[in-house]
Structure formats: structure tokens, C-alpha cells
Amino acid sequence: MHNQLLDRSTTTPAAQARHSSRGPEGGRRQFRVSVSGRIGAPPVQVYAVIADYREHHPRIVPPEYFRRLDVLEGGVGAGTRTQIEMRVLGVTRVFEQVVTEPQPGRVLMETNQDGSAVTTFTVQPAGTYAATQLTITTDITARPGLAGFVERLFTSAMLRRIYQKEFARLAEYMDHRAHFGLVEESLPWL
């Protein structure tokens, strides 16, 4: 099975940033970065890789940005707690996330412990069940004023770049697993 982001229009996943109105945090604004693309593997297999923070998820995050991804609790799906160390443009940031599954097998969410960012992975069939349409969306609470404006511009661009690399790594990882017969046909926890 060949995995890639299909056709020229989706080779680089479609991305958008949306800015919303003032939030409840004293003038802070919410903004969204969303990237979608097609992966040439069944949704159940793609979801299994994304939801497994012990074995698979660390292999798809771009190592040039993600220095560490440690599982503090759980490890697969809802209830997983992670600590992540990221380095972007020379700045290192460590934060904890909690994983929930509003729709197990289809929607997985990572929420920063302080609530400042929520990343949602949405997996659905792309045409047939042999391919997946994956959307990664992050909703972020920005600071007010000029600092928040700069933060929105910078963060939107960086997240798009990170997610495009994550898509490429996921497609390559799914190819590797299919080539060596390492895919699960069903997942008992779904």
C-alpha cells in the first residue's frame, strides 16, 4: 500500500488560520490553525498510530521540534497524560497534555494542562476505507494586543510547518508498517 498526501493540491496539506472574537480571559483571543490531508492507509490504522503515545505517536512527530514526548499516565487513547518538550527557533518549552476521545476511533483531543491550546485529530474515510482524510486542528488562546497579534502570525506559520512534517512522517510510517506487515486489522480498545 502506498501512502502519501495525494495529488498536487494536497501534497502540502491545505491549511488555514481563523481568528475569532475576544475570549473570556480578559481580552484574549482564540485562533485556530487547521491542516488537512489524505493518508493512504485505513482510518482505523491511522487512528491507532495517533492514539498510541507509548509506541507510535512519538515516531510521527518531527524530532527537530519535539525533543521529548514522555507518557506520564496511560499511554493509549483517553486518559493518557504526556509531558512534551518542544524547541522552536531556539526557544524550549515544556508542557503537559491530557488526551480525551470525544469520538473514539474518529476524534482524539490533546489539551494543554493550562487550557491555552487544544489540538484535535479527526480521522475519517477518504473515499473508501483504504485511505484516510486526517485533519489536525489547534485552537489557541493568544495574549491580548500587539503581542497576541504577533503570536497568532508566528504560531500559525510554525504550526502549519510542523503539521506538514507530521503528515509526511505519518505517511512514511504507515508505508513502513504496511510494507513489513505490521498493521493491526482491528483494535480491541475501539
Per-range role (PLM):
Residues 2-73, 190:
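Hydrophobic ligand-binding cavity/cleft-lining segments
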Residues 27, 109-165, 170, 181-183:
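Beta-strand/loop substructures that line and gate deep hydrophobic ligand-binding cavities in soluble
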Residues 30-38, 44, 81, 94, ...:
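Intrinsic-disorder/low-complexity, polar/charged segments enriched in Ser/Thr/Lys/Arg/Asp/Glu/Gln
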Residues 35-37, 71, 95-101, 118-125, ...:
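Hydrophobic/aromatic beta-strand elements that line small-molecule binding cavities or substrate pockets
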Residues 39-41, 88-90, 101, 140-144:
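Beta-strand elements of well-folded, non-transmembrane domains
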Residues 43-44, 74-77, 101-105, 122-133:
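A short, structured loop/turn motif at beta-sheet edges
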Residues 81-87, 107-113:
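Short beta-strand segments that buttress and anchor functional surface loops
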Residues 179-190:
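Short, flexible loop/turn segments with low-complexity composition
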